[in-house]
Amino acid sequence: MSDKTPRKPTAFRLEQPARVSAASEQEEPRRPRAVKDLEQITPQADVFDLTDDEAAELEILDPAFEAPERKGWSLSRILFGALGILVSFAIGIWTEDLIRALFARADWLGWTALGVAMVALAAFAAIILRELVALRRLASVQHLRKDAADAAERDDMAAARKAVDALRTIAAGIPETAKGRQLLESLTDDIIDGRDLIRLAETEILRPLDREARTLVLNASKRVSIVTAISPRALVDIGYVIFESARLIRRLSQLYGGRPGTLGFIKFARRVIAHLAVTGTIAMGDSVMQQLVGHGLASRLSAKLGEGVVNGLMTARIGIAAMDVVRPFPFNAEKRPGIGDFIGDLARLNSDRNARK
């Protein structure tokens, strides 16, 4: 053990480190004072942006598509049907007389003509069958559109599932819809309201197609606008607008899974033109455009560039009408494109071209 006596407990005063208050570190607030000669930046409005009133007027000329009611036999249908039967009889009699004459001249000529006639008949039957299948597919798309709208309005889950299954069948060959179809297939056993199921199918399956369709419409409108601006004759403008519009209609129908044949394309184009005629925008010219945008847009461009914008907008209008006709579901969850979505791009395209000259 140690000889040292233990130290008695003693109280000690500890030296506390100096604390710097946060308030002292802060600088004193600057007294308010007047500042002069500030540099003011005034934003310039885009001359090609539409006001709310102008956009509303554009939307009035761009109503949604409503499928016309199917009418009975008309006089024009009876006329063309009777003429078609007469032409078929004439071709048949002419072919028979030709084969008989060839048999009278030489047997091998007659048999050759008969074989060629059989091949032509088989090819004609195959073409007719393909066209009938395409027409049936186009009709099924129109019926599906009505069924989907009715199921969403009544919030019918059974009808909605039936419409979604039909949509998945139509979009089965479209790679862009694979992810959406897989998602909807995984929800087969889930309980979902009919209206929500229709909106979900529209978002997951048709949204990628809508995005690509808008790109097709915008590119076609730009091409028409440029060709109109540089073409020397109005006949060239009209011809190219018709060509580009026909190609746009066919590409949109193929995009949404319609795949129309020749007769189906003609019927589809008639529906698009009828939709345009009902809205009264197929004859929209430069004077109408000046009234439409308050004498603003067309007056800011030269006459030729203004014609390019008008023809480009007409092509966009045809593309929007084609989307209305061929889209399997009506626009519900997704926003329907309008003319206002394309007018700014077309005007800027032509103004940039004018600035480079």
From Swiss-Prot:
The keyword Cell inner membrane applies. It is a multi-pass membrane protein. Keywords: Cell inner membrane, Cell membrane, Membrane, Transmembrane, Transmembrane helix. The chain crosses the membrane at residues 78-98, 109-129. One of its GO terms (cellular component) is plasma membrane. It is found in: Cell inner membrane. Residues 27-36 have a biased composition (Basic and acidic residues). Residues 1-36 are annotated as: Disordered. InterPro entries: DUF697, UPF0283. It comes from the Bacteria. HAMAP family: UPF0283 (MF_01085). Belongs to the UPF0283 family. NCBIfam families: hyp_HI0043. This is UPF0283 membrane protein BMEA_A1074. It comes from Brucella melitensis biotype 2 (strain ATCC 23457).
